[in-house]
Structure formats: structure tokens, C-alpha cells
Amino acid sequence: LVALGTGLLWFGWYGFNAGSEMRVDAVTATAFLNTDVAASFAAIAWLMVAWLNEKKPKFLGLLTGAVAGLATVTPAAGYVSPTTAVIIGIVSGVVCYYAVEMKNKLQWDDALDVWGVHGVGGFLGITMLGIFATKQFNPAGADGLLHGDPTFFLKEVTAAVFSSIWAFVFTYAMLRIIDIFTTVKVSESSEEVGLDESLHGERAYEQIVD
């Protein structure tokens, strides 16, 4: 099921990155290719780092790494070279893996690793766009730090920082407001029983045996 879901996400991501241009040209093709390249290399990088640290390769890690690559390359897909997409994929696979590991050690309640994969990956992608962007692959874009424009890099970092602050403040505020009317977090006993059974009185998968 996880593999099927990841495949659907991957396919849908073409709409994010390539389809959002609303036409077919060289930039569309670049975004399409970069999406595949970054996701593939991120999956391999995550798998290898997990293998080194945990002594066993895990299929779930491979899939999570692919999603990390997709999330990270999204800001940059139409503005960088395929070679840069390889770098973005490898860096995102490694960095997001350790972000998730940090989350686990700190025991944050993030069952889907949204912070470590999408949050850290998105921040990383915006920052790397500021470093690697080039007009060679998208004349309508800008040149990044490595191509002689430190101003664009600073703009991207500033945008990433303020977006992170905005997301944290308003998410926290909304959760506090919601918590006034209903419990945001379920109890540990409900989690142990399973939310399908504890909240809805039924199991989604009856074939599962305790």
C-alpha cells in the first residue's frame, strides 16, 4: 500500500513541477526530468544512509527518500540542470533522513514525518534554488549564487525563513483554537488500540490478526 501511494504521489508530482507551466516546451521537459532524477537519487541516498546506520536496507526508507526528493526539488525543478537535480536528490535524501532521526530521538508526534520530509525538504529546496538556479535552463528565471547573483540567494533564504516562521506561528495558533473546542491529540491508549476502532468502532483491515 505504501509503495502504491508513493507511486501515485510521484506521478502526481509531475503536475506540480512540469504541469504547472501550463504549456509544453524545454522548461517543461527540464522540470519533468529533474523531478524524476531528484526523487530517484534521494531514494537511493536515503536507503544507503539508513543501511549504514541501521545495518539493514528498508523498503519504507527507499520510498520515504523518494518523497523527500520530490518535496525538495519542487522549488527548483524548472530552474536548474539535471546534474544539479542529482545533487539536490542526494543532499535531500541524506539531510531529510537525519531530520527524521532527530525527530524520533526528540519524540515529536509526527507519525508521517511531515516535518522531516516536507518541511526540511522544502526549506532545503528553496535554499538550493538560490544556489544553483541558472538562466541557461530557464531564461525567465534568475542566476543563483554559483552563477554570480548573491542577491537572488539572499532572497530565497529570506523567503524560506519567513515562510517557516509564518507556518509555525499560524499552525500553532490554529491548533490552540481547535483544542478549545475538541481534543487535537488522541490518547496513547486510543493509538494503541487503533484509531479506526477507538474512534469509529470498526477496523479498516479485518484480516489483520493481533
Language model segments and positions:
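Glycine- and aromatic-enriched membrane alpha-helices
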Residues: 1-210
